[in-house]
Amino acid sequence: MRAPATHIGDVFEIPISDSFKRYMQFVVVDSCQLGGWGIRVFKKDYPLDCNSAIDDILNGEVDFFCLTRAIGHGVLDGLWTKVGKSKDLGDLDKMVFRTYVERVPGILASHWFVWKANHNLKEYKTLPRRYRKVDYGGVMPPSHVVERIRTGRWFKVQNVYDDYDSYLTKWGCERISVPFLRQQRKD
Protein backbone atom coordinates (compact mmCIF):
# COMPACT_ATOMS: atom_id res chain seq x y z
CA MET A 1 0.00 0.00 0.00
CA ARG A 2 1.21 3.47 -0.81
CA ALA A 3 1.52 6.24 1.79
CA PRO A 4 -1.06 9.02 1.41
CA ALA A 5 0.10 12.40 0.11
CA THR A 6 0.72 15.01 2.79
CA HIS A 7 1.02 18.74 2.38
CA ILE A 8 2.22 21.67 4.45
CA GLY A 9 -0.62 22.76 6.71
CA ASP A 10 -2.09 19.28 7.24
CA VAL A 11 -3.29 18.61 10.81
CA PHE A 12 -3.21 15.12 12.33
CA GLU A 13 -4.63 13.57 15.48
CA ILE A 14 -2.55 11.11 17.47
CA PRO A 15 -4.15 8.71 19.98
CA ILE A 16 -1.86 8.66 23.02
CA SER A 17 -3.89 6.40 25.33
CA ASP A 18 -7.25 4.63 25.52
CA SER A 19 -8.97 7.90 26.37
CA PHE A 20 -6.85 10.82 25.07
CA LYS A 21 -5.40 12.18 21.85
CA ARG A 22 -3.17 15.06 20.76
CA TYR A 23 -2.70 17.00 17.56
CA MET A 24 0.23 17.91 15.34
CA GLN A 25 0.65 19.99 12.19
CA PHE A 26 3.05 19.60 9.26
CA VAL A 27 4.52 23.11 8.89
CA VAL A 28 7.76 23.09 6.87
CA VAL A 29 10.24 21.06 4.84
CA ASP A 30 13.59 21.87 6.46
CA SER A 31 16.35 22.16 3.87
CA CYS A 32 19.04 22.23 6.58
CA GLN A 33 18.54 18.72 7.93
CA LEU A 34 18.14 16.12 5.17
CA GLY A 35 14.91 17.69 3.96
CA GLY A 36 13.16 16.64 7.18
CA TRP A 37 9.49 17.46 7.50
CA GLY A 38 8.99 19.88 10.38
CA ILE A 39 5.99 19.35 12.62
CA ARG A 40 4.69 21.13 15.66
CA VAL A 41 3.01 19.04 18.34
CA PHE A 42 0.43 20.67 20.57
CA LYS A 43 0.49 20.26 24.34
CA LYS A 44 -3.19 19.89 25.22
CA ASP A 45 -4.68 16.41 25.61
CA TYR A 46 -8.19 15.99 24.18
CA PRO A 47 -10.69 13.21 24.93
CA LEU A 48 -10.86 10.68 22.08
CA ASP A 49 -14.53 11.44 21.42
CA CYS A 50 -13.94 15.22 21.21
CA ASN A 51 -14.07 16.86 17.78
CA SER A 52 -12.31 20.19 18.23
CA ALA A 53 -12.19 22.94 15.63
CA ILE A 54 -8.86 23.20 13.79
CA ASP A 55 -8.53 26.89 14.72
CA ASP A 56 -8.92 26.08 18.44
CA ILE A 57 -6.24 23.39 18.20
CA LEU A 58 -3.78 25.64 16.37
CA ASN A 59 -4.23 28.43 18.92
CA GLY A 60 -3.07 26.05 21.67
CA GLU A 61 0.39 25.89 23.21
CA VAL A 62 3.08 24.02 21.25
CA ASP A 63 4.70 21.19 23.23
CA PHE A 64 7.66 20.66 20.90
CA PHE A 65 8.88 20.86 17.33
CA CYS A 66 10.55 17.98 15.54
CA LEU A 67 11.65 16.69 12.17
CA THR A 68 10.37 13.46 10.67
CA ARG A 69 10.61 11.95 7.24
CA ALA A 70 7.51 9.90 6.74
CA ILE A 71 4.28 11.58 7.82
CA GLY A 72 2.34 9.46 5.33
CA HIS A 73 3.87 6.30 6.77
CA GLY A 74 2.63 7.35 10.21
CA VAL A 75 -0.88 7.30 8.70
CA LEU A 76 -0.24 3.86 7.13
CA ASP A 77 1.05 2.50 10.44
CA GLY A 78 -2.03 3.77 12.27
CA LEU A 79 -0.02 6.14 14.46
CA TRP A 80 -2.02 9.23 13.41
CA THR A 81 -4.84 10.27 11.10
CA LYS A 82 -5.35 13.41 9.04
CA VAL A 83 -8.21 15.57 10.34
CA GLY A 84 -7.86 18.79 8.39
CA LYS A 85 -5.69 21.51 6.94
CA SER A 86 -4.89 25.13 7.79
CA LYS A 87 -2.86 27.92 6.26
CA ASP A 88 -1.94 29.09 9.79
CA LEU A 89 1.54 27.61 10.32
CA GLY A 90 2.41 29.53 13.48
CA ASP A 91 5.67 31.38 14.06
CA LEU A 92 8.35 29.38 12.23
CA ASP A 93 11.09 31.45 13.91
CA LYS A 94 10.31 29.53 17.12
CA MET A 95 11.23 26.30 15.34
CA VAL A 96 14.87 26.04 16.45
CA PHE A 97 16.88 22.81 16.48
CA ARG A 98 20.24 21.62 17.74
CA THR A 99 22.43 18.61 17.15
CA TYR A 100 25.84 17.47 18.35
CA VAL A 101 28.63 16.08 16.18
CA GLU A 102 31.10 13.85 18.02
CA ARG A 103 34.81 14.35 17.56
CA VAL A 104 36.68 12.06 15.17
CA PRO A 105 40.39 12.19 16.13
CA GLY A 106 42.48 13.85 13.46
CA ILE A 107 39.49 14.53 11.21
CA LEU A 108 36.71 16.41 13.00
CA ALA A 109 36.40 18.39 16.23
CA SER A 110 33.32 18.04 18.47
CA HIS A 111 30.81 20.81 17.99
CA TRP A 112 27.15 21.81 18.06
CA PHE A 113 24.97 22.89 15.17
CA VAL A 114 21.99 25.16 15.86
CA TRP A 115 19.53 26.34 13.23
CA LYS A 116 16.06 27.68 12.59
CA ALA A 117 13.97 25.86 10.00
CA ASN A 118 15.23 26.72 6.50
CA HIS A 119 17.98 29.03 7.82
CA ASN A 120 21.74 28.54 7.79
CA LEU A 121 23.41 26.39 10.42
CA LYS A 122 25.37 28.08 13.20
CA GLU A 123 28.30 26.13 14.59
CA TYR A 124 29.41 26.31 18.25
CA LYS A 125 32.14 24.52 20.18
CA THR A 126 30.11 24.95 23.36
CA LEU A 127 26.33 25.13 23.25
CA PRO A 128 25.17 28.63 24.35
CA ARG A 129 22.73 28.73 27.28
CA ARG A 130 19.91 30.15 25.19
CA TYR A 131 19.89 26.98 23.07
CA ARG A 132 20.08 24.38 25.83
CA LYS A 133 16.35 23.71 25.83
CA VAL A 134 15.69 23.81 22.10
CA ASP A 135 14.54 20.63 20.40
CA TYR A 136 16.83 17.92 19.05
CA GLY A 137 17.24 18.26 15.28
CA GLY A 138 17.58 14.67 14.15
CA VAL A 139 15.09 13.32 11.62
CA MET A 140 12.96 10.89 13.63
CA PRO A 141 10.73 8.04 12.45
CA PRO A 142 6.99 8.35 13.21
CA SER A 143 7.13 5.80 16.06
CA HIS A 144 9.69 7.96 17.91
CA VAL A 145 7.48 11.03 17.51
CA VAL A 146 4.58 9.18 19.16
CA GLU A 147 6.90 7.92 21.91
CA ARG A 148 8.00 11.50 22.62
CA ILE A 149 4.36 12.61 22.86
CA ARG A 150 3.41 9.77 25.21
CA THR A 151 6.47 9.73 27.49
CA GLY A 152 8.42 12.94 26.90
CA ARG A 153 11.40 10.90 25.62
CA TRP A 154 12.47 10.06 22.10
CA PHE A 155 13.18 6.40 22.82
CA LYS A 156 11.80 3.72 25.08
CA VAL A 157 14.08 3.75 28.10
CA GLN A 158 13.72 1.05 30.70
CA ASN A 159 13.23 2.15 34.27
CA VAL A 160 16.39 0.95 36.00
CA TYR A 161 14.81 1.03 39.45
CA ASP A 162 11.90 -1.21 38.40
CA ASP A 163 14.36 -3.68 36.86
CA TYR A 164 16.39 -3.63 40.08
CA ASP A 165 13.30 -4.30 42.21
CA SER A 166 12.25 -7.23 40.01
CA TYR A 167 15.79 -8.64 40.25
CA LEU A 168 15.73 -8.41 44.04
CA THR A 169 12.28 -10.02 44.22
CA LYS A 170 13.41 -12.85 41.95
CA TRP A 171 16.25 -13.70 44.32
CA GLY A 172 14.28 -13.13 47.52
CA CYS A 173 16.29 -10.10 48.59
CA GLU A 174 15.23 -6.83 50.15
CA ARG A 175 16.17 -3.40 48.95
CA ILE A 176 18.55 -1.66 51.30
CA SER A 177 19.14 2.02 51.64
CA VAL A 178 22.71 3.17 52.05
CA PRO A 179 22.93 6.63 53.59
CA PHE A 180 25.49 9.01 52.21
CA LEU A 181 28.65 8.54 54.23
CA ARG A 182 30.59 11.64 55.02
CA GLN A 183 34.25 11.26 55.67
CA GLN A 184 35.20 13.06 58.84
CA ARG A 185 38.40 14.96 58.85
CA LYS A 186 40.87 14.28 61.62
CA ASP A 187 43.10 17.18 62.56
Predicted regions and their residues:
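Short N-terminal edge-element motif at the start of the domain
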Residues: 1-47, 52-53
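Intrinsically disordered, low-complexity, charged/polar segments
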Residues: 47-187
